[in-house]
Amino acid sequence: MFALPGYDAFLGFLLIAAAVPVLALVTNKLVAPKSRAGERQLTYESGMEPIGGAWIQFNIRYYMFALVFVIFDVETVFLYPWAVAFNRLGLLAFIEALIFIAILLVALAYAWRKGALEWS
């Protein structure tokens, strides 16, 4: 059917995977009610009307804690497969993991020294 016969099933799956969300969006546009007045235009948060404005001061410390968390969370993702296959891996893989952990400890010490982990 196509130039690469081994990929017919994959191409069919890809077409179906692309068509399903498009079909869902088109169906929603056709079936959804068209009312644009009254209650529909009001904003709400968690089922309640908001009080005050939406612009508030956001403490940058949340951002720094989140960034440090993401860095060390990704470290866990990289170290988990190594820990699972620890018995099959040799000494070289152990040394590589130690170097990886050492680099991350240097990054943690740097963040600590710069005050990224202090809440003030």
From Swiss-Prot:
Listed Pfam families: Oxidored_q4
A GO BP annotation: photosynthesis, light reaction
Entries under InterPro entries matching the protein: NAD(P)H_OxRDtase_bac/plastid, NADH_UbQ/plastoQ_OxRdtase_su3, NDAH_ubi_oxred_su3_sf
Cellular component annotations (GO), alphabetically ordered: NADH dehydrogenase complex; plasma membrane-derived thylakoid membrane
The keyword NADP is assigned to this record: yes
Catalytic activity: a plastoquinone + NADH + (n+1) H(+)(in) = a plastoquinol + NAD(+) + n H(+)(out); a plastoquinone + NADPH + (n+1) H(+)(in) = a plastoquinol + NADP(+) + n H(+)(out)
Transmembrane segments: 6-26, 64-84, 89-109
Subcellular location: Cellular thylakoid membrane
Assigned EC number: 7.1.1.-
Bilayer topology term: Multi-pass membrane protein
Enzyme kind, highest EC tier: translocase
Keyword Translocase included in the entry's annotation: yes
Keywords, sorted A to Z: Membrane, NAD, NADP, Plastoquinone, Quinone, Thylakoid, Translocase, Transmembrane, Transmembrane helix, Transport
Molecular function GO labels: NADH dehydrogenase (ubiquinone) activity; quinone binding
Subunit structure: NDH-1 can be composed of about 15 different subunits; different subcomplexes with different compositions have been identified which probably have different functions.
Family: Belongs to the complex I subunit 3 family.
Function: NDH-1 shuttles electrons from an unknown electron donor, via FMN and iron-sulfur (Fe-S) centers, to quinones in the respiratory and/or the photosynthetic chain. The immediate electron acceptor for the enzyme in this species is believed to be plastoquinone. Couples the redox reaction to proton translocation, and thus conserves the redox energy in a proton gradient. Cyanobacterial NDH-1 also plays a role in inorganic carbon-concentration.
Protein name: NAD(P)H-quinone oxidoreductase subunit 3
